[in-house]
Structure formats: C-alpha cells, structure tokens
C-alpha cells in the first residue's frame, strides 16, 4: 500500500468509526436474522440499510417488500438494492405513520451524550411495532447492562419478551472493528412466560429495574432479600487492629444490630490530634 492508499485507509476507518457503519457481511449474522423472522410480514422496516446486506439476504429467502432508510447517500449500494426505493434521511428525525409486524437492522454504534445511538434506534423501532410484532437487531452485548438502556428495557419487558438471542462470542465479525455483538429477537407480546432461546438453549429471562440476566432455572422475583435477611452496608478499613480503637476512635460505625464500634478517621496525616498521630506511627 503506497502512502496515498494508506492515508485513504486511515480516513476511511475514521469515517466508519465516526458513523458507526459496520456492515453485516458475515453469513452467520445474516442467517440468524433470517431464522429469527417468525412472523409472516408483507413489509419489513430496515431503518439503517447501509449497503443493503440484510435486505439482500432476506429478499433471497422471503417474498417481502422493504421500507428502507439510510442517512449516508455516499454508501455504494449492493447490486439488487433499488436506490430509488431508499429513503435517505435521519431515521431518528422522521415521522413514520406505519407500524410494522417485522423490523430488522444493524443500527449504528455511536456514543452519544445519553448513551449510544443504537439504543435510540431500538427505542424508536420498539414504538413502531404492531402488537405481536418482532424486532430483530444486531447490537453490542452491553445493551442488557448499560444504565442508559435500563428504562427502555424495563418498558420493553413490561409488554413483551426477548424470545431469541444468538451470541456468537466472536469479536471479529465486522471489518475494521472488534465488537462483541448479539442478535436478538424481541416480540411485543406479553401473554407468554419470559423464556428465551439463548444460543438454542432454554433460559429464563430475569428483569430487575431494567437489568437483564438469564438463568437456567426459574427464579421467583416476587420476594426480596430483605424478606429473609437483615441487610447492612459493610465497611472495610484495611487494618482493623490499627483503626478500630475505642479510646482514640472519632467516628462510630454500626457493626451489628444496635451495636456501634469506634474507628479512627483522618483525611490527612499528621492530623490535629497528637495521640492519634503517635498511635498511627
């Protein structure tokens, strides 16, 4: 690669990262998206088609129409994608009057002040689902852990369930990036038990204040730890034999129910107390 090509490659990578454009070229991800389409849609929304990888692979298997959006007009579309049918726009800013039985996508992964753009895409698409509609997205695995996603996840679980998840445990599925991703199928149907087929294994989905975890066994979330235990926040001083001192201690900490223990607390050394200074030497 000559200097000019190297410079172009650096610019291209910077552009790709700034836009969060990681195209779905890997066949395992494409196949999973197709397999997760369990409804029989006539029209599928794809809010960020990129080159059109997902549209092409789904069109090869299913006879459906697509509502296609893309913000970047500079992307070279794949053969088979009709440019005239692509709505070039900022998906987050346009109003869509339709609701959909099926929405698929690989949204942009771009950090924002409030979290990440892919979470905003999920939020908007969730609200564009019909009852019993399915949302099938490829996203970073941190989606279930991010504080910025807790409110959305809590709302989604209140009216539906993540029925299928494919986690390939492979960070090399995109060019120019190492990202741990998963494919999820969410169904806006709250009539069934919160069971998830996770990498083809049956798991029980647990949602607590927007934090999603999975268990091999069913867990009763109606009872709290406080129903069984007295819970207190502990304190570790680092050296009990030095800082725990009934004579020189200047703060009291709850060490047991109705029992307090005195500890030495200073924010700098030497302190204003000569006896404490001598003790700590």
Regions found by a protein language model. Give the residues of each.
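Long recognition/docking surfaces used for binding and targeting
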Residues: 1-8
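Signature of N6-adenine DNA methyltransferases within the class I
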Residues: 10-35, 42, 48-230, 236
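Polybasic, glycine- and aromatic-enriched phosphate-binding surface used to engage nucleic acids
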Residues: 217-281
């Amino acid at each position: 690669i000559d200097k000019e090509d190297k410079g172009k490659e650096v610019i291209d990578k910077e552009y790709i990262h700034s836009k969060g454009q990681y195209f779905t070229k890997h066949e395992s991800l494409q196949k999973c998206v197709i397999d997760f389409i369990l409804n029989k849609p006539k029209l599928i929304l794809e809010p960020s088609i990129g080159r059109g990888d997902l549209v092409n692979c789904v069109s090869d298997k299913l006879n459906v129409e697509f509502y296609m959006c893309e913000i970047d007009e500079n992307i070279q579309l794949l053969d088979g994608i009709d440019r005239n049918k692509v709505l070039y726009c900022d998906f987050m800013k346009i109003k869509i009057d339709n609701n959909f039985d099926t929405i698929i996508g690989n949204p942009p992964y771009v950090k924002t002040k409030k979290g990440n753009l892919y979470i905003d895409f999920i939020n908007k698409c969730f609200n564009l689902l019909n009852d019993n509609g399915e949302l099938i997205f490829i996203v970073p695995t941190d989606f279930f852990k991010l504080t910025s996603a807790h409110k959305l996840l809590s709302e989604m679980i209140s009216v539906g369930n993540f029925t299928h998840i494919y986690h390939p445990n492979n960070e090399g599925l995109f060019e120019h990036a190492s990202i741990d991703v998963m494919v999820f199928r969410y169904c806006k149907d709250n009539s069934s038990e919160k069971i998830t087929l996770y990498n083809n294994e049956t798991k029980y989905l647990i949602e607590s204040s927007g934090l999603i975890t999975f268990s091999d066994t069913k867990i009763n979330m109606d009872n709290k730890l406080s129903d069984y235990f007295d819970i207190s926040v502990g304190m570790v001083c680092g050296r009990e034999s030095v800082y725990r001192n009934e004579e020189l201690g200047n703060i009291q900490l709850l060490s047991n129910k109705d029992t307090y223990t005195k500890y030495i607390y200073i924010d700098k050394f030497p302190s204003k107390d000569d006896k404490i200074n001598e003790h700590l030497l």
